[in-house]
Amino acid sequence: MAGQDPALSTSHPFYDVARHGILQVAGDDRFGRRVVTFSCCRMPPSHELDHQRLLEYLKYTLDQYVENDYTIVYFHYGLNSRNKPSLGWLQSAYKEFDRKDGDLTMWPRLVSNSKLKRSSHLSLPKYWDYRYKKNLKALYVVHPTSFIKVLWNILKPLISHKFGKKVIYFNYLSELHEHLKYDQLVIPPEVLRYDEKLQSLHEGRTPPPTKTPPPRPPLPTQQFGVSLQYLKDKNQGELIPPVLRFTVTYLREKGLRTEGLFRRSASVQTVREIQRLYNQGKPVNFDDYGDIHIPAVILKTFLRELPQPLLTFQAYEQILGITCVESSLRVTGCRQILRSLPEHNYVVLRYLMGFLHAVSRESIFNKMNSSNLACVFGLNLIWPSQGVSSLSALVPLNMFTELLIEYYEKIFSTPEAPGEHGLAPWEQGSRAAPLQEAVPRTQATGLTKPTLPPSPLMAARRRL
């Protein structure tokens, strides 16, 4: 079936709906928010699709991201009289997404569905806490028609002014470039062909130009969008990239107990300003911005803009197989996968996971346990070399990330074979000086270099 995810299991609680490929997760937008796409052209005729099941599947999917800021891209092309839901259904759907904080009127009917009983996502506390509209930061409607305008007028009395400001219309796909990572979007071929037709019929007018700048050599002080090797070469052999070190140190000192850390987005203007300062080698003082979520967004942005994911393209297929490993052997499986990483990637990953493990240990305050952190960081650590990760791929990707965070000490405390990773310089005891003493205290950014926290391995050795 066109659009179906080949990795989709028939045991999926919503297989009857998911097999059509109507919903896809397409990485993050330029604001660091998770992107979910909805493609009308993949909706079968109404007699072949239970629209109530579609609504429940949409909620099931969004429930994985609703605690974080997120974006929806709605591809309107392909909606017709044969597959169009009724206006009454649309009104009831909007009202259901407006339910929150203890509205249980839908609960008995939902749990009575035998297929939903097998799904663990519908626990009562999580249903109470649905915040679909609150954390939806943008709804991009692509190729709107007169039907959309009529529908908007019908639903307008139900839609708040604040929510209405989140809806943005795009006549052409090219208009998405400014807001999203276009190459990560899962766009059906039918939508691409329709967009080409629209442009050719637009009376010779050229479509809105994309704002992708021409490629330029990176600055010597460049921090974003360059490889780990480039950062090492330009920072006197430092293995931990300066942006990663400074944001982690700041968050360790001031953000570990911040509720919802890493869940919120930040102003794109602020993010770009900080990126510009870092790339120009200028100092950044996060205290000046007065928002602890800004360095958290900068950290995710740095990982997301690496030319190759920190876990590397080569490890992608191995990581997808983690769900096939027996539960008791998964930690060992993670260690085996990490053995294939380049040494530099391994050291940076260990540093990052040590920090995220510390965040998870404060989850009673910040509400960010290893599972929640994995949902945020999974797609920032690994993605395929071509296209984007499918919805079904998110399960193993997030599981792998959760294991790295939850079992950090077991996975990273014992070094691999000497020829592979060995000990990082700051974990080599008397054989090497600590990293913070092995390089100058001032980096290209002009900031004072923070002191590394002791690693669990070093602490264990001291106890011995």
From Swiss-Prot:
The record marks 263 as: Arginine finger. Highly expressed in kidney and placenta. Also expressed in colon, skeletal muscle, small intestine, stomach, and testis. Not detected in brain, liver or spleen. Overexpressed in the majority of colorectal tumors examined. GO terms for molecular function: GTPase activator activity. Disulfide bonds: none annotated. Keywords: GTPase activation. One of its GO terms (cellular component) is cytosol. Residues 439-464 are annotated as: Disordered. Residues 13-199 form the CRAL-TRIO domain. SUPFAM superfamilies: CRAL/TRIO domain, GTPase activation domain, GAP. CDD domains: SEC14. It comes from the Eukaryota. Pfam families: CRAL_TRIO_2, RhoGAP. Residues 226-412 form the Rho-GAP domain. Gene3D superfamilies: CRAL-TRIO lipid binding domain (3.40.525.10), Rho GTPase activation protein (1.10.555.10). One of its GO terms (biological process) is small GTPase-mediated signal transduction. GTPase activator for the Rho-type GTPases by converting them to an inactive GDP-bound state. This is Rho GTPase-activating protein 8. It comes from Homo sapiens (Human). The gene is ARHGAP8.
